[in-house]
Amino acid sequence: MVNRRCKQWALAVCAVVWMVALLWVSPATAVPLDLNGKFEILTGEVSTHTPGKVKLIEFADFYCPHCHLFDETAVPLLVKEFGNKLEITMVGFPVIRGKLLTAFDMYEQAKLMGKGNEMRTVLFRTIHKDKIDGVLDRSLREALIKEVGLDPKAFEEGMASGKPSKAVENGKRWGERIKVSSTPSILLDGNIKVDGANMTQENVFTVIRSILENDAKK
């Protein structure tokens, strides 16, 4: 009798454990069945989705011409189409060999000082339009820092602190963990990856729009 009760208790406990496990895992991997477009669900990553908004993380290399094109053409179109329903953040992911990480450090420091988007635009322009893709020395950095409206002294002190380089390294590890194979690649709401041949304007718009449309149905 005692053994039977023990077995019943054990089964009940197991059932509760499995229910908790399912409730814990499902928010991280749940994706609406009618989500449109081409994408990959990263089952090991946690969803960061909040109703009515999509968080887009762009993994990009400042020296990558495709990343510059995405920043110059796709980003403005995405902002125009989705407005405040879309939050775009770039994460530096160096893939071009032989380039120093100074541009990535500058971007991270500017982010810390509230001017990340401005610095991103200036760096892409400097490298791809002004054709300055060599060493970003201190005098050039000062001009760019002033252009985005930041204090050069405070900026350089932040650069020397090591925080920007640590942020760059963390971003690189993140990209490697989710197996970013090319730039630009995007991560939507923490666990929906769009990359490679799927990084067409039409497909990116389709996936984002369908996420928001699914929210509207709820």
What do these predicted regions represent?
Residues 3-4, 31, 146-218:
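C-terminal cap of thioredoxin/glutaredoxin-like
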Residues 55-57, 84-87, 118-122, 149-152, ...:
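A short alpha-helix capping/helix-coil boundary motif
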Residues 63, 74, 79-82, 110-114, ...:
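Sec/Tat-exported extracytoplasmic proteins
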